Structure formats: structure tokens, C-alpha cells
């Protein structure tokens, strides 16, 4: 029995069309809360034995073909506001990273590193996303979240344990807002920088294909702040190339010919195709270099019960 809500609660909702890779089975339930009060009330009344899984726009996610035995919580309107208050940029967890970068730039504040990061602010904080030498950890002041028990809490960035592509946000907590500190900048200059970033991305990454962004973490040096050495020679794509896996295929899944650290759905791929190809890449890279790549794409859910 699910608690009453003012938002939308759907049983057996397929998730494939909510992910960038367009694969995956159904969630037991999909909850799209109307606002913070609706979200908090639902979590407070929800059976603690039933898992919850916060989901953004599915940009960094493989949902397995058997679906997800959980309540998937997907924030939308009511959670995507953006405002600038002096040096602070406050964004709802459902705000797109690109929109936050643009809104900040219009106000003369520099969060340009977010412009080419796919997904939402909630996911960017949870994964300590970064680009062009800047990371969420470098700018984050604090976050607001709803706990699994339905309590609203505010946490300083230092309490999140932000590191390279990870955080220690407790399982089941739902981020609702994040505040960033952003340096001042000329709006026109910031806009030009973002245009250059987009051009650079589009010339080197398969942005026209169905992908989930970078597939594996770079095995480069990094510190507890999340800063990575972007000039480090040890890049995941180089290791993949050296293992002969650029362009490798399994079913409808392929390691992109354009950028070999991008796993793409060429059409008709299953989650098993995509994850299986990724695991084969890990195996081949380890055989070639002795280095074990780590997934950057999150994989969740179960295999189909009738899997042979």
C-alpha cells in the first residue's frame, strides 16, 4: 500500500524512455512529487523496507532489463528553480547542469564547467561531476535534502565526503537543492567560453549517439577534494585503445569509434548488451595493462527472471 500523494505515482512504470541509453525494465513504482512537502510526506509514510532510488534524467545510468525493485523518485517541476544571490548560485536538484551554467553566466557568475556536463544538479552533486579541471567540490557550499524518514536537512559540502566521481550521501536521501559559490565574470566572456566548450565537446565526443557520457573513470591522480589531474597521461580511452576495444560491439552496443570511452546504443541494444560489453572492456584492459577500470556509469536493477 503506497501513501497518498499530490504528485504522480505510477505502478510498473517502464524506465527505458527515461534514460539516455533507452534501455531497462520497469520500476515497481515511479513517484514524481509535486513539491518538497509532498516528497517529505511520502518518505515519512513509506515502508522503510521498500528501497527508494532517486533518479535524474537518466544521463549516467543503465537500468538492467529486469527492472528495479524499488520506488524510483524523479524530481521535476517544483525542483528545478535557479536563482543568483551575490556570489551564491542556488539550484534545484532537477535543474539541468547546462541551464545552471547559463543562468549563472547571465548574472555574471562563473559555473561554466557545468555547461557540458549532462544531467541534473542532483546527479552532479552525488557524483561530484567535473569538467575542464573544475569539480562540484570546488564550488559547493551546502545542500538541502530529504532523508529516508522524511526530514528536511541542510548539509555543508564538507559533510558529503566528495571525492573523484563520488560522495557519501546516505542511501535513500533525496537531494532537493544545492548552493554553489561562483566567481564573478563578464557575461559575454563566459558565454564565449561555454560556446568554445560545446564546440570542443562536439568535435571529440559522440554527442549525436545514444550514450551515457563517459563509461569508465580515468585512473588518474586525484585528491580528497575531487580535483583530478586532467593532464595525467593515464586516460581510460587510451587504455581501451591499447586493449584493441575501440569500436568493439556486442549486440546493439558499441564502444564509440569517435571516443572509445563512450558506450553507445546503436539501436536495439539491451541493458545486458551494454553492461556485458563494458565488462568485456574491463577484462581486456586488465589483460593488456594490469589496470582495472572502474565504471563511471551507474548500473542498477535486476536481470530478467527468465534469463537463460
UniProtKB/Swiss-Prot annotation:
Entry protein name: UDP-N-acetylenolpyruvoylglucosamine reductase
* Record field: compositional bias (Basic and acidic residues): 197-211
Q: Which cofactor does it need?
A: FAD
- State the gene name recorded for this protein: murB
List the record's Gene Ontology CC terms alphabetically.
Answer: cytosol
Q: Chief location of this protein?
A: cytoplasm
One Pfam family this sequence matches? MurB_C
Q: Which domain of life is it from?
A: Bacteria
Q: Per the database record, which ranges form the FAD-binding PCMH-type domain? A: 22-185
Kindly list the places in or outside the cell where this protein is found, as annotated in its UniProt entry. Cytoplasm
Q: Which HAMAP family match?
A: MurB
List the biased-composition ranges (Polar residues): 212-226
InterPro entries attached to this UniProt entry:
FAD-bd_PCMH, FAD-bd_PCMH-like_sf, FAD-bd_PCMH_sub1, FAD-bd_PCMH_sub2, MurB, MurB_C, MurB_C_sf, Oxid_FAD_bind_N
What SUPFAM superfamilies does the database record attribute to this sequence? Answer: FAD-binding/transporter-associated domain-like, Uridine diphospho-N-Acetylenolpyruvylglucosamine reductase, MurB, C-terminal domain
GO process terms (BP): cell division; cell wall organization; peptidoglycan biosynthetic process; regulation of cell shape
- Species, as recorded: Cereibacter sphaeroides (strain ATCC 17025 / ATH 2.4.3) (Rhodobacter sphaeroides)
Catalyses: UDP-N-acetyl-alpha-D-muramate + NADP(+) = UDP-N-acetyl-3-O-(1-carboxyvinyl)-alpha-D-glucosamine + NADPH + H(+)
Give the active-site positions. Answer: 165, 214 (proton donor), 296
Q: Name one GO molecular function term.
A: UDP-N-acetylmuramate dehydrogenase activity
UniProt family annotation = Belongs to the MurB family.
Q: Where in this protein does the record put region Disordered?
A: 197-228
Amino acid at each position: 500500500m503506497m501513501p497518498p500523494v499530490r504528485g504522480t505515482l505510477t505502478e510498473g512504470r517502464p524506465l527505458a524512455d527515461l534514460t539516455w541509453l533507452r534501455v531497462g525494465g520497469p520500476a515497481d513504482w515511479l513517484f514524481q512529487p509535486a513539491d518538497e512537502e509532498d516528497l517529505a510526506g511520502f518518505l515519512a509514510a513509506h515502508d522503510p523496507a521498500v528501497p527508494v532510488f532517486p533518479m535524474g534524467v537518466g544521463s549516467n545510468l543503465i537500468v538492467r532489463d529486469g527492472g528495479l525493485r524499488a520506488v524510483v523518485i524523479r524530481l521535476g517541476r517544483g525542483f528545478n528553480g535557479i536563482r543568483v544571490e551575490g556570489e551564491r548560485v542556488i539550484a534545484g536538484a532537477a535543474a539541468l547542469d547546462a541551464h545552471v551554467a547559463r543562468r549563472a553566466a547571465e548574472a555574471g557568475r562563473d559555473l561554466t564547467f557545468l555547461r557540458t556536463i549532462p544531467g541534473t544538479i542532483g546527479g552532479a552533486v552525488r557524483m561530484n561531476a567535473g569538467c575542464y579541471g573544475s569539480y562540484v567540490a570546488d564550488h559547493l557550499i551546502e545542500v538541502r535534502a530529504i532523508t529516508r524518514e522524511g526530514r528536511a536537512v541542510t548539509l555543508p559540502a564538507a559533510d558529503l565526503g566528495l571525492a573523484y566521481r563520488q560522495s557519501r550521501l546516505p542511501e535513500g536521501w533525496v537531494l532537493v537543492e544545492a548552493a554553489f559559490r561562483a566567481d564573478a565574470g563578464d557575461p559575454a566572456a563566459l558565454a564565449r567560453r561555454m560556446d568554445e566548450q560545446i564546440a570542443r565537446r562536439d568535435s571529440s565526443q559522440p554527442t549525436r549517439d545514444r550514450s551515457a557520457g563517459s563509461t569508465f573513470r580515468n585512473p588518474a591522480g586525484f585528491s580528497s577534494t575531487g580535483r583530478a589531474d586532467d593532464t595525467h597521461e593515464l586516460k581510460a580511452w587510451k587504455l581501451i585503445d591499447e586493449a584493441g576495444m575501440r569500436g568493439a560491439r556486442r549486440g546493439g552496443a558499441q564502444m564509440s569509434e569517435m571516443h572509445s570511452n563512450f558506450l553507445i546504443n546503436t539501436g536495439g541494444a539491451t541493458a545486458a548488451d551494454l553492461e556485458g560489453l563494458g565488462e568485456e572492456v574491463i577484462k581486456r584492459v586488465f589483460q593488456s595493462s594490469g589496470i582495472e577500470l572502474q565504471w563511471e556509469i551507474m548500473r542498477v536493477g535486476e536481470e530478467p527472471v527468465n534469463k537463460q
